[in-house]
Amino acid sequence: MKVNKKIGLKKQRLSENLPGFSSQKKMAVIKVNKLIQLAFKVPSNPKPSAVSIVLFPYKNDIGFFLTERTHTVDHHKGQISLPGGAQDTNETLLETSLRETKEEIGIDVDLELIGTLSSLYTPVSNFLIHPYVWYADSIPETTLNNNEVSNIFTIPLNDLLDNEIIVEMPKEIKGVIINVPCFHFRNCDCWGATAMLLSEFKDILKNL
């Protein structure tokens, strides 16, 4: 199937009802029960933020970028994430998505908005994350903001769709080592909030 047709199908699907938390919770750090589900309930004063899944043609497939955060950022130090960050005053969340993507990894090309995924509240940082899905006609050139990003990885969508890469790995959370569900990609391990967002995206892609 040609890339443009694939993108068209994704755009159509993202305009329909989304699976939301039922998909996100599959990659939650702690098994989701009623108590944990309350932890993901959005409070009255969350910090709005936006992240970007930037799709582009890649080796007869479609790829997207993940980043490794530095150990000097305020939240989620050293973790694998999507480019994005907190909303500034007087900007829309869509504008936040584009601005943060440019600031973190230097993407400064015209992007086509494909759609949005379900928002996700992260209790650890009090962020309410709004994911935007974009498309670039070719692989965008990137320049890392070394204050926020230490590395960037290109992930083929076919890898995301491979159930074999979902594993449990030991991670330290608040001084305690626990096994967490993780996307064990070829070049990085993605867990936590970003994995929860990608879990919904994966379920959407599987049903195209």
Can you say where each PLM-predicted feature lies in the sequence?
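N-terminal leader/linker segments that precede catalytic domains of diphosphate-processing enzymes
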Residues: 1-81, 85-139, 171, 176-208
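NUDIX/MutT-family hydrolases
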Residues: 144-184
